[in-house]
């Protein structure tokens, strides 16, 4: 019996290229999975793109910001400072939340801090959805940072869709709207006009659906045609 193995971000991207009826609706998709870490999946021409060594799509380790005023700084441990994962993964939102808790003493985040509880990304999302202004601002900054990465993806692949999944998708439009706005501000004129930037549609089921679709794609090579 044939067995096919791939990583979770790749199969999630494959699922997101398909609708709820599992029909292929987007042939070129870039997916960001934003949670404890930042992963990425690429679907090009209706099939997972893996690259020369099978490791394509490590979008979390692309560099968003680096001090290049002088010599290029020596690399540090992964995630590298300035990488997408360093500034967008859950621990980055944890840092923003801790700062907000200190700066805004009347916020829900400050109450967590006053109770001696760690202020985590899940608390930020929950507080933002409940209308806490400082938490909503942290989610907005989070979305803006993701938007820069989305702009890079649009410049590189000119995809039909860029999808944001993982825990970040729980923030909904509070995250998506700033991500979309910044992405479109940072792309060249004309680029992105046909790119849909959206949240993942399949949620926690994306991995399972994508795994099933992977088997179908491998067993039926013309399925994406």
Residue ranges and their predicted role:
Residues 55-70:
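A short, polar/charged loop-to-alpha-helix boundary motif
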Residues 15-30, 66-225:
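ATP-binding/phosphotransfer module of carbohydrate and carboxylate kinases, centering on a glycine-rich
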Residues 1-22:
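Active-site neighborhood for divalent-cation/phosphate handling
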Residues 4, 29-33, 39-41:
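Short glycine-aspartate micro-motif
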